[in-house]
Amino acid sequence: MGVFAGPNIVEDGLVLALDASNTKSYPGSGTTWIDMSGNGHNATLHSVTHSSANGGIFDIPGGSANFIENNTIDLSSSDFTVFCASRHTGSDNLRLVGGRNNNFLVGHWNGYSEAFYAEGWVGGYGNNVLAATQNSTDWRVYHGCGNISSDSYDFYVNERTRTSGAAQGSEGPDGLIIGKTLLYSNNDYESAAGEVSFVYYYNRVLTK
């Protein structure tokens, strides 16, 4: 499922590039997921497993000790796009891809698979989150985008527009965390069992 080696990856504005299928990003061992953007925003692996399934993925088994994090990138005040692919795999089905240091998530939350929270429910909680599929284990590819200066946010799932031009967000991601959040309950909250293939951050809005 990895995509970095292909011809269609946009490089303009790319500030973080993590791809489990590319040996330049993960050579097959160790606890570092290497940022291929050249900006040094490597992620640290905490008790997660690499698999060759779907070309290369990381398996997060769920629980507070099993997660992936980066604490060097901050797009909270920048225009942004988060491009990622992930899926829930079990009943521990809360957060997967999100911001480490702020309340930001793209994709999975509380059993739902099409959620986008950027310090506000983009598209609205009822229209965006509750209207989507719950308890799905299907892979999905997400684009969560935000233009901070114009207060406009877009959300695409498998290239399908979920929300366009919404005004409910307020920040991009501060850091990266996959598998839980560090914001509440003594840094141990909303863990998820799932798989992730790639995560890319851009410091601009990508258009469909």
Say what each PLM segment does.
Residues 1-2, 123, 172-201:
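Extracellular glycan-interaction patches encoded by glycine-rich segments
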Residues 4, 37-65, 72-75, 82-169:
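Extracellular glycan-interaction surfaces
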Residues 10-11, 76-77, 169, 188, ...:
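Extracytoplasmic/secreted proteins and extracellular or luminal domains
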Residues 16-20, 35, 80-90, 142-144, ...:
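Short hydrophobic/aromatic patches on beta-strands that form ligand-binding or substrate-lining surfaces
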Residues 1-14, 23-29, 195-208:
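Extended recognition patches within non-cytosolic domains
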Residues 22-25, 89-91, 183:
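Short, solvent-exposed loop/turn segments at secondary-structure junctions
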Residues 20-48, 208:
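Short, tryptophan-glycine- and acidic/Ser/Thr-enriched carbohydrate-recognition patches
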Residues 14, 54, 80, 138, ...:
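Residues that flank catalytic or metal-binding motifs in active/ligand-binding sites
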